[in-house]
C-alpha cells in the first residue's frame, strides 16, 4: 500500500516591508511549519499606501534580519492594489497546488485580497484556515467606515473557512461574539515564545541596585503607557531613584500627548524615550539591559512583546486583560495586575522588581505550534467539504448575521 501524500500548505501573512509584530509571527510560524513538512509562503508586500500607514516613514527600511529557509518556496509579494502582483500571486498558487491555505488575520486592509486568495484556493481544492491575532485592529475598530466594511464583507471570507485558529480561550469567545463563528470550528494554539532575536551580549548587571523597567512596542491608546507614567509619578523621589524607565516605541493614533506626558513627568530624569520603531539589534540591547518588562495594556488579544520578554526570560508585569493571563499562566516570572490603575501597576512593579532577570522560561515553543498546526491540517485533509460556495449569510459556519 502507498501511504497518502501529506497535505501541502501555503502560509499567507505580512512581509518585512510593513514590518510589524505579525510579520515576526508569520516568519516564525513559517520556519516552524517548514521544519516539519513542505510549506510555501505568500507574503503581503504593500499593505496600504505608505502615506496612510501610521509608521509610513519607515516603510521599506531594513530593520529586521528575520528570514525563511532558502528551500521554502516564497513569493514576496501581493500588493493591496493587486495589479501585476495579483497575477504573479495567482500563478504562484497554481504552481504550489496547496491542500490548505493559512491566512493571518489582524486587519481589515487585507480582506479584499483574502477574498481573492480564498476563492482561488478553494477552486484548486484547498481548505482555508484563518488565524486571528486580533478580531480587528483596535484603530480600525474605532473607525466607523472601516469597522462597518469589515462587519459587512468579512462573512464572505469566513464562510469559506474550514477552521479557525486563535491563541487563547479568550480569543475564541472574541471571534465568536464578533463574527458569530461556531466555537467548534475554532482551534486554540497558544502563541509560541519569540526567539528570533539573536542574543549578542551578556546581560548587564544592575548599577547600584537600580531596576530598569522597559515599555516596548507601539504607543497606542490601548497600550496604557499613560498608566505606567502615572505609576512612576506616584513614587516619591527616593523610590523613583531606584528605577529607570525606558520607553521604546513608535507613536500611533495621535498619541504624541502621551509621549509629552512622559517628558513632563515629575520623574522625567528617570525616563528615557526612544520614540521610533527600532531594529532587531537595538531591541536585543534594550532587552539585555532590562530587569522588568511592563505591559500596562487596556485591551489585548495577545502580545508579541510578552512572548519576546519571555523569550529573554525576563520578569513581566502585565494587566489582566484579554488573553494575557492565559499566555502567562505557566510563566513563573509573570505578575498580573488590574488594568486602568496606576496604583495597581505600581504595586505589581514593587512585587516583581527583585525577580531575577534572565532566569525564567516559557514552555510553548515553535515546535509545539508546528505540531498542533499540522495535526489540524491533517484532520482537515480527511474531512468532507463543509463550507458554502455561495454568499448566503445563513451559512452553517456562521449563524445569521444581525
Task: Report the location of each language-model feature.
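N-terminal strand-loop element at the rim of the active site
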Residues: 13-19, 30-95, 250-254
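Nucleotide-activated donor-binding/catalytic signature segment of Leloir-type glycosyltransferases, i.e.
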Residues: 258-277, 281
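Carbohydrate-associated surface elements
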Residues: 170, 192
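Acidic donor-binding loop of glycosyltransferase active sites
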Residues: 162, 285-301, 314
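Short hydrophobic beta-strand element within catalytic cores of glycosyltransferases
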Residues: 315-320
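Conserved donor-binding/catalytic core segment of Leloir-type glycosyltransferases
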Residues: 205-223, 229-232, 246
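Conserved acidic donor-binding segment of nucleotide-sugar-dependent glycosyltransferases
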Residues: 330-331, 335-342, 349-354
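Membrane-proximal helix-turn-helix segments that form the acceptor-binding/catalytic region
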Residues: 119-123, 146-164
Amino acid at each position: 500500500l502507498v501511504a497518502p501524500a501529506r497535505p501541502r500548505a501555503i502560509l499567507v501573512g505580512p512581509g518585512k516591508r510593513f514590518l510589524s509584530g505579525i510579520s515576526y509571527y508569520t516568519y516564525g510560524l513559517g520556519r516552524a511549519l517548514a521544519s516539519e513538512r513542505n510549506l510555501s509562503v505568500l507574503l503581503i508586500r504593500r499593505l496600504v499606501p505608505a502615506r496612510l500607514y501610521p509608521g509610513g516613514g519607515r516603510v521599506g527600511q531594513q530593520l529586521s534580519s528575520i528570514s525563511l529557509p532558502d528551500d521554502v518556496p516564497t513569493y514576496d509579494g501581493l500588493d493591496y492594489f493587486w495589479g501585476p502582483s495579483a497575477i504573479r500571486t495567482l500563478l504562484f498558487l497554481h504552481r504550489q497546488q496547496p491542500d490548505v491555505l493559512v491566512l493571518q488575520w489582524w486587519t481589515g486592509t487585507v480582506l479584499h485580497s483574502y477574498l481573492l486568495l480564498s476563492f482561488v484556493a478553494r477552486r484548486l481544492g484547498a481548505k482555508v484556515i484563518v488565524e486571528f491575532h486580533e478580531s480587528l485592529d483596535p484603530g480600525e475598530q474605532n473607525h466607523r467606515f472601516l469597522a462597518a466594511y469589515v462587519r459587512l464583507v468579512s462573512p464572505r471570507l469566513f464562510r469559506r473557512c474550514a477552521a479557525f485558529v486563535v491563541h487563547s480561550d479568550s480569543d475564541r469567545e472574541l471571534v465568536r461574539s464578533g463574527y458569530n463563528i461556531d466555537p467548534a470550528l475554532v482551534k486554540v494554539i497558544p502563541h509560541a515564545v519569540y526567539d528570533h532575536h539573536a542574543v549578542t551580549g551578556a546581560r548587564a548587571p544592575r548599577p547600584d541596585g537600580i531596576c530598569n523597567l522597559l515599555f516596548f512596542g507601539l504607543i497606542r491608546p490601548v497600550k496604557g503607557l499613560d498608566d505606567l507614567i502615572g505609576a512612576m509619578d506616584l513614587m516619591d523621589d527616593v523610590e523613583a531613584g531606584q528605577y529607570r524607565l525606558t520607553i521604546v516605541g513608535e507613536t500611533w493614533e495621535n498619541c504624541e500627548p502621551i509621549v509629552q506626558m512622559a517628558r513632563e513627568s515629575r520623574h522625567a530624569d528617570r525616563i528615557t524615550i526612544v520614540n521610533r520603531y527600532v531594529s532587531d539589534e537595538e531591541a536585543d540591547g534594550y532587552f539585555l539591559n532590562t530587569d522588568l518588562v511592563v505591559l500596562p495594556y487596556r485591551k489585548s488579544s495577545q502580545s508579541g512583546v510578552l512572548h519576546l520578554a519571555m523569550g529573554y526570560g525576563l520578569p513581566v508585569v502585565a494587566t489582566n486583560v484579554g488573553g494575557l493571563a492565559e499566555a502567562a499562566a505557566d510563566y513563573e516570572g509573570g505578575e498580573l495586575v488590574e488594568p486602568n490603575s496606576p496604583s495597581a501597576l505600581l504595586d505589581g512593579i514593587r512585587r516583581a522588581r527583585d525577580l531575577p532577570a534572565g532566569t525564567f522560561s516559557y514552555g510553548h515553543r515553535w515546535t509545539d505550534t508546528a505540531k498542533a498546526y499540522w495535526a489540524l491540517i491533517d484532520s482537515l485533509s480527511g474531512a468532507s467539504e463543509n463550507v458554502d460556495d455561495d454568499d448566503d449569510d445563513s451559512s452553517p459556519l456562521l449563524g445569521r448575521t444581525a
